[in-house]
Regions:
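Hydrophobic transmembrane alpha-helices
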Residues: 1-34, 69-72, 85, 121, ...
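Alpha-helical transmembrane segments of multi-pass integral membrane proteins
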Residues: 95-96, 124-136, 165-176
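Functional transmembrane or membrane-interface alpha-helices that line membrane-embedded catalytic
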Residues: 107-137, 144-149, 190-196, 212
């Protein structure tokens, strides 16, 4: 039973409309960050009555995407008369699920601390997730390749080799994203351990590590400030490749770039303000060898 008749899951006509809006609107929305300095999350979060607790807010703004995609994958094929989907569709849906199992569920659990998230930031993230998952999920469930010959045509000369290569690139990006996140987590774990030793020796309370920062130096952090962002781009580029360079996967990849690039740019300014130009200038921001 559809949750919203004609829209969730969408008819083909409505899916095409959503996909067009998704491609055109989010680059504009993401680019607003070049002129709006406020960002109520993470390093730049501030006290507000409209803040959500960090872990809860993160889960609530990340989980709608994978929930929507799985719902569409389980309902739309039957509505359009598809008995079974090719293995490629299931693999791509699985990759999406793996990513968000980490980002939506595991990530907030294993973070040593999380700053509050303003409800406006969370709301915009929910909108991103819903539009993206509706576009991708509908494509994988019914409106993209749904037979072996259609997949042969979509992948073209690259064939299965392109699909496998795309998956490999995806997993390289996923691993890079996780391990660079882990390096950021270790900064706060180390600070907490240091404080616990001091507290035990001097019988004082442990101070919160919510706002404890330093410039990380491990792995790609030696050369750039936001390798975890870059690795996420690598992930979704691989996904786009494996999908046969599909429009929904391209829109996801490009919209990630439009949203995250200005965030990295403002993040560099924050690092300079906190630690000085001398410690930051030798590092790229987000694209090695370019910016």
């Amino acid at each position: 039973m559809p949750l919203i008749e004609g829209w969730l899951p969408p008819t083909r006509e409505n899916w095409e409309t959503i996909t067009t809006v998704w491609q055109l609107s989010w680059p504009v929305f993401g680019s607003l960050q070049y002129v709006v300095n406020w960002y109520g999350m993470g390093k730049t979060s501030v006290q507000s009555r409209l803040n959500l607790p960090g872990r809860i807010g993160w889960f609530l703004m990340e989980i709608p995407g994978v929930a929507t995609l799985l719902y569409i994958m389980n309902t739309l094929p039957g509505q359009v008369g598809i008995d079974d989907l090719p293995w490629q569709n299931k693999v791509l849906a699985g990759l999406f699920t793996i990513h968000y199992a980490y980002r939506a569920v595991i990530f907030p659990i294993i973070q040593p601390s999380m700053s509050p998230i303003h409800i406006l930031v969370a709301s915009s993230a929910v909108a991103f997730q819903l539009m993206n998952a509706t576009c991708l999920g509908s494509y994988l469930a019914a409106y993209g390749p749904t037979t072996a010959p259609q997949w042969d045509k979509a992948l073209g000369l690259g064939g299965v080799a392109q699909f496998v290569a795309g998956i490999a690139v995806f997993y390289v990006g996923l691993a890079g994203n996780y391990f660079h996140d882990e390096e950021l987590r270790e900064i706060r774990r180390a600070e907490r351990r240091r404080q616990e030793k001091v507290a035990a020796r001097e019988k004082t309370a442990v101070v919160s590590v919510d706002k404890h920062y330093r410039i990380p130096e491990a792995m790609l952090f030696r050369y750039m400030l936001f390798p975890h962002y870059f690795c996420e781009w690598v992930e979704w580029f691989g996904f786009w490749m494996a999908s046969g360079w599909s429009v929904p996967a391209r829109a996801f990849f490009l919209n990630e770039v439009f949203v995250m690039f200005p965030r990295a740019r403002s993040g560099r300014r924050w690092y300079v303000e906190q630690f000085g130009e001398e410690k930051v200038r030798r590092k790229w921001t987000i694209i090695p060898g370019v910016y």
